[in-house]
Amino acid sequence: ELVDDEPETEWIGEEEWGDEEEEDVAVVEEELPNFVDNGDGTISDTRSNLMWKKDDSYEEFKYGITWFEAHDYCEMLNDKKFAGYDDWRLAGIEESKSLFSFTQANSDKDGAEIHISDLFETGGGHNTWTYEEKPDYQQYAQKFSYVTGNDVWEHKDNEYSHCRVTRDVVQDEWEPEWRKDTKTFER
């Protein structure tokens, strides 16, 4: 059964493989993000127009944090104007999913494989809090795993996780550092 917000999945089973011993395999079509390292501790995804902090909260604290502490972390980055911006926030579930790709490999704080671009710093957490709260039960918030690609609802106060912060990029404000000094061609 397909869920509306999941990518189209095609199942390849024993009929195609001809081996009754093999399990079915899911093949998911995905559009890879187009990441650019901005050289200031951030990475821009030019497909989604999001800018991400290159490392996550684990790199800052060396321990997991609650959902409320994740919001405090965003506020701290905004107060410091990290990379010159004061609009850092928790990502939504779809934004968090946009970093995930089985074709990408990085490693978390324990050396386990996570499926995000290797442009992001290694040694961070394997999952992230999102800003999304559970409808009708707001003690829970959604968390996304970069190991499995699954999301789960967790208690905001009793569960410890990590957070990858993001911000929206206004199309005119962002350009790679190398392009800033180039002249545009005029006829």
Predicted segments, located by residue:
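Disulfide-stabilized, aromatic/cysteine-rich ligand-recognition loop
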Residues: 146-175
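Acidic/polar residues at beta-strand termini and the immediately following turn/coil
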Residues: 45, 101, 142-150, 179
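Active-site donor-binding loop signature of nucleotide-sugar glycosyltransferases
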Residues: 54, 131, 146
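An exposed tryptophan-centered "aromatic clamp" motif
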Residues: 71-89, 93-143, 154
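N-terminal compositionally biased, intrinsically disordered segments and leader/signal-like regions
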Residues: 10, 104, 131, 149, ...
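Short solvent-exposed loop/turn micro-motifs enriched in small/polar/acidic residues
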Residues: 35-37, 121-122, 158
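Short, flexible loop/turn elements at secondary-structure junctions
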Residues: 56, 94-95, 133, 167-169
